[in-house]
Amino acid sequence: MYLVAFRLAPGEYDAEFHELNDAIQAAAEQTEGYLGKRTWHAPESEEVLVVYYWESLDALESFGADPDHKRGKRRWTEWYDAYEVTITEVVEAYGSGFGDDTDPPL
């Protein structure tokens, strides 16, 4: 499994951002090997962390080739003040007690 951590400082979102963001999310969900995502908002700032879960690197790379995703990456300065992407291969994931809707999609 692979995780993509997308850390961002939001800027100004307009209607075009929301339309493109929805299209990118739909493309992710339609990509074979997409396992889900989790979103956290930092209480002391406007910073957001979104973690995407992928079954394999091939699945992630397939999504990375999506035209809407590429367009969003090129236009990040229009909507974000800052961003950081970290891609990690998961060696092991375990835990208990958060419930089915928040446990890592294994």
Segments and roles (model prediction):
Residues 1-48, 57-65, 81-106:
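Short S/T/G/P-rich N-terminal loop/turn motif that feeds into the first structured element of a domain
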Residues 70-74:
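A common structural junction motif
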